[in-house]
């Protein structure tokens, strides 16, 4: 059964008015399996400022609703859409267009040690 990890929304978050993330997850054999809900307008870059604005760990995943733009440190971008399987190496951030008609929802797999450490830092940036 998936368990809530944390939720960040406008009342918790200092970064942007439309920052709305819900995350559920579970540990399986040293891997974290997390389901993310990113509302339209979500930009995770401000939450990654401790890491230079880019996520320091790789993720594997599947997008089952909506779409998101993944931006890499080298300036390249790719759009992940519903039905896409993806791999995001370390050095990425993501943005959901504020005019998107639906939220972006993904399931993502990450090394538990890396994921837990990174998510703890990001969660500390949320308002209490």
Language-model features, listed with the residues they occupy:
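Short acidic-glycine-tyrosine-enriched beta hairpin
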Residues: 74-91
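Short acidic, glycine-rich loop/turn motifs
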Residues: 28, 72-74, 98
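A short, N-terminal "cap"/entry segment at the start of jelly-roll beta-barrel domains
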Residues: 1-37, 42-45, 50-52, 124-128
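A short, polar/proline- and glycine-enriched secondary-structure boundary/capping micro-motif
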Residues: 45-47, 81-82, 116-120
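Short, conserved beta-strand element in jelly-roll/cupin
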Residues: 53-70
